[in-house]
Regions:
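A post-motif C-terminal structural segment
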Residues: 43-336
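Active-site nucleophile/metal-coordination loop of metallo-enzymes that catalyze phosphate/sulfate
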Residues: 1-60, 73
């Protein structure tokens, strides 16, 4: 079983060395179409767990080769291969020493260009938003790789030069492509991951995490609109929780601090009531001036509305400046 003694090196198997059957392998065995969509690299942990078998999650070159038909390293339990694979991680599909479509370096060490191999096998390959928008049902199977590594945060996506689709757009397109002609379709299994919510939290960036979550909510709403719920099953879950906690008892909306009440309701002024200010930070807002005081409101009642932190100092001077500014939105106080 899985407990605190499980080590990172442990293999995803049944204990005697045999690889477990993945959910996409089961779907393929039933004759279903299968697809994977992620805003992270398509070779990252969550998407890879649906179709690949490796001893270590970091073996992303091997994971990429297992997803699509090419040579003996392909996961033959997937039969003809994934019908649809969209997300980031382009560098694991092209050989080192070569640059990709956006001039970024590739990472494969075996000299293989999986992008060309899958096109030779009948796949449609797209790498930007314009090509993505042109995809039609007849273009299945499809490989879409929209970034060298993880796709951009939703907040930053409009600034991508090549153009990237959003997770809600990829969800909509994937459903259209996988449904195909209903008369010859035995159904489909689609896994959609909003992988960058987690990344924003690890960077202690509450704002980008919230924007990612909002876009994921749009993706769920898109799926609910597009399918007939008398037949498909839509499951929304998470692989773990995170550090974003709404707490306290603010009467003001989160986005409109100047309009806070001067004091808390009377029942919260009773010393027998737990005030649950998660961060033990006391702020007061004057309804007349809108100014924030570190001393609290006139009754010294904490108005903590957000408990949030993950990891070390996000402004660590030892970190790469470009990454730090990208992740934390430094220079834009609304993003910190």
């Amino acid at each position: 079983g899985l407990d605190k003694t499980t080590e990172r090196r442990d293999f995803n198997g049944d204990g005697d060395g045999r690889a477990l059957v993945t959910v996409l392998e089961q779907a393929k065995k039933r004759g279903m179409r299968v697809g994977v969509v992620s805003t992270a690299r398509v070779t990252h942990a969550t998407p890879a767990a649906t179709y690949a078998h490796v001893n270590e999650r970091g073996l992303e070159n091997d994971i990429a080769a297992q997803a699509l038909p090419g040579d003996a390293t392909f996961n033959k339990r997937l039969r003809g291969g994934l019908d649809l694979l969209m997300g980031g991680g382009r560098r694991y599909f092209c050989p080192s020493g070569m640059t990709d479509e956006e001039g970024e370096s590739c990472s494969r060490t075996d000299g293989r260009d999986l992008r060309q191999e899958v096109q030779d096998a009948g796949y449609s390959y797209v790498y930007n938003r314009a090509e993505f928008n042109l995809l039609r049902k007849r273009d299945l199977p499809v490989l879409g790789l929209f970034d060298r590594s993880h796709m951009d945060y939703e907040y930053d996506r409009p600034y991508d030069l090549a153009g990237e689709p959003s997770i809600s757009e990829m969800t909509s397109k994937a459903i259209d492509l996988l449904e195909g002609k209903r008369r010859d379709n035995k159904g489909y299994f689609l896994m959609v991951e909003s992988g960058r919510i987690d990344h924003a939290h690890h960077a202690s960036n509450a704002d980008r995490a919230m924007v990612e979550t909002e876009e994921f909510d749009k993706a769920i709403a898109t799926a609910l609109r597009k399918v007939d719920l008398r037949d498909p099953l839509i499951v929304v879950t998470a692989d773990h929780s995170h550090v974003f906690t709404m707490a306290g008892y603010p009467l003001r909306p989160l986005h409109d601090l100047p309009y806070a009440p001067v004091s808390a309701p009377a029942d919260y002024l009773d010393n027998t009531v737990d005030h649950s200010g998660i961060l033990d930070v006391v702020y007061g807002i004057s309804a007349s001036s809108g100014e924030i005081s570190a001393a609290g409101d006139k009754d010294s009642v904490p108005y903590t509305i957000l408990g949030y932190w993950n990891g070390g100092n996000p402004y660590d001077t030892g970190a790469a400046g470009v990454y730090r500014d990208m992740a934390l939105g430094r220079g834009d106080p609304r993003r910190d």
